Amino acid sequence: MKKQDIIFGIHAVEALLKHSPERIIELWLLQGREDERLTPLIRQAKAFGTSIQVTSRKVLDEKAESTQHQGIVARVKAAKILAEHDLDELLAKTDLPFLLILDGVTDPHNLGACLRNADAAGVQGIIVPKDNSVGLTAVVSKVACGAAETVPLFQVTNLARTMRHLQEKGVWIVGTAGEADCELYQADLKGPLAIAMGAEGKGLRRLSRECCDTLVSIPMSGSVSSLNVSVATGICLFEAVRQRRS
């Protein structure tokens, strides 16, 4: 198990300072960079007694393993990994669960975008399989723009078993499939809900599909056969939001 991680990008570090400042071990800043957005972050980091180093772009690129760090990189204590047994605590806190299941999403940009969508829609937790899925990497946190610190991510060893457990707890699981007869806008998404999305191209795996209470499709009018998983996720989540508010 990793004890430390790297986080980079203004929004990612800002969210960490707001929600879990105790996790930040050290902060590296780009020498000579003048950006008003960095000033309050530096002030907060100093208030928490965080070690701050000013360094070159080459060093930041190496530490972030990316050039998209916006002049700020943090070495942090690894986030707590939530598992299947932690779901019961989450479910006990709400009468109307709203969850997202991502089956086989291995691209960090897609997971980051899904986290951002989930945060905006008010999703209470995202469930991913421990294998065949990307974890909370630095790129995921950067793309998520802070949502990696606000939306709990549950990594489970057996996704089908977890889905059945959710059903036993009264959660209705709606999966997506391009060939499904029921369209998204015809489905009832008002109650305790988990929306299950598959990887782009492959879709939900067979066992995951079999564990869904119903399958829905997103109506498509053009010539393309599928959408990016983060786009499809946003469409499904906000249709649920619309219904739950009406």
From Swiss-Prot:
Binding site for S-adenosyl-L-methionine: 198, 218, 227
Lineage top rank: taxon: Bacteria
InterPro entries attached to this UniProt entry: 23S_rRNA_MeTrfase_RlmB (IPR024915), Alpha/beta_knot_MTases (IPR029028), Ribosomal_eL30-like_sf (IPR029064), rRNA_MeTrfase_TrmH (IPR004441), SpoU_MeTrfase (IPR001537), SpoU_subst-bd (IPR013123), tRNA_m1G_MTases_N (IPR029026)
EC number(s) on file: 2.1.1.185
Keyword Transferase: yes
SMART domains xref list: SpoU_sub_bind
A Gene Ontology molecular function term of the record: RNA binding
Catalytic activity: guanosine(2251) in 23S rRNA + S-adenosyl-L-methionine = 2'-O-methylguanosine(2251) in 23S rRNA + S-adenosyl-L-homocysteine + H(+)
One of the Pfam families matching this protein, by short name: SpoU_sub_bind
Enzyme class: transferase
Stated role: Specifically methylates the ribose of guanosine 2251 in 23S rRNA.
Entry protein name: 23S rRNA (guanosine-2'-O-)-methyltransferase RlmB
Organism: Shewanella oneidensis (strain ATCC 700550 / JCM 31522 / CIP 106686 / LMG 19005 / NCIMB 14063 / MR-1)
